[in-house]
């Protein structure tokens, strides 16, 4: 790891701040600075491609490019659906697309460090969460090395009958994160993507009137045994049978 990238990580991750969520609470940096940091991350992503990248196919590249535009919607809708039996041909297409994106991720650079995610989560789930609990995301999980980008995704309240609250995640990436900045159509997002069924252990929670800040770290499924687990999307407790299927697939 060269000196330039170490300096870049310091800038991206706001490591100079002493409090866990300072990077998410500080005023946004200028658009020019954020754009430059995203370009630097894109350059690093391309430079970090190893021998695996030589095996990436044209279909896989196209799938990742499409994922950042609109493909994520179909893929994640399918992965989060409680019943996919009615999807028909669209379901078969979705499954093939998901397999292609997952295959591409395995050939893209791994990322370890800090990322951020902004989203909306059911209030009923937030009321139950405690430090040490594990969140399981059945869909792909998009994060960014730039807190400014993460915050943009939690501005507009989704159209949902559920009571939702804005949540900003700080993610310590130990495993499972792959940068798609070198392929994504939205390279300015400095995106780090996780495959379906990523596991995030809660390390810190800070609740305010407008936001909930949650610090998490990625963990292996096998390391989350005997731990309270929740489906991040549905808010439901992950039961043993479902948990077993995640471990075995």
Name what the model sees in each region.
Residues 19-249:
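Mono-ADP-ribosyltransferase
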Residues 9-11, 195:
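A broadly tuned, weak detector of single residues within folded domains
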Residues 13-15:
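N-terminal signal peptide c-region/cleavage motif recognized by signal peptidases
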Residues 2-8:
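Sec-dependent signal peptide recognition
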Residues 8-9, 246:
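Secreted/extracellular small peptides and ectodomain modules produced from precursors
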């Amino acid at each position: 790891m060269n000196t330039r990238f170490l300096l870049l990580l310091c800038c991206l991750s706001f490591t100079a701040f002493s409090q866990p969520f300072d990077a998410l609470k500080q005023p946004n940096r200028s658009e020019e600075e954020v754009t430059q940091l995203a370009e630097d991350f894109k350059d690093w992503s391309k430079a970090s491609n190893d021998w695996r990248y030589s095996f990436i196919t044209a279909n896989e590249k196209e799938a990742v490019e499409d994922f950042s535009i609109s493909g994520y919607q179909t893929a994640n809708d399918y992965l989060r659906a409680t019943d996919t039996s009615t999807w028909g041909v669209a379901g078969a297409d979705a499954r093939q697309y998901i397999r292609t994106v997952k295959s591409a991720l395995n050939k893209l650079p791994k990322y370890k460090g800090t990322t951020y995610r902004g989203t909306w989560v059911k209030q009923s789930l937030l009321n139950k969460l405690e430090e040490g609990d594990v969140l399981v995301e059945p869909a792909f999980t998009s994060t960014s090395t730039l807190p400014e980008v993460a915050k943009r995704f939690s501005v507009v309240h989704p159209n949902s009958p559920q009571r939702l609250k804005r949540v900003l995640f700080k993610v310590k990436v130990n495993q499972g994160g792959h940068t798609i900045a070198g392929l994504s159509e939205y390279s300015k997002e400095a995106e780090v993507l996780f495959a379906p069924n990523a596991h995030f252990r809660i390390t810190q929670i800070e609740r305010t009137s407008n936001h909930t800040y949650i610090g998490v770290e990625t963990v292996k499924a096998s390391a989350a045994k005997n731990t309270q687990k929740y489906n991040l999307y549905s808010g439901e407790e992950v039961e043993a049978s479902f948990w077993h299927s995640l471990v075995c697939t």
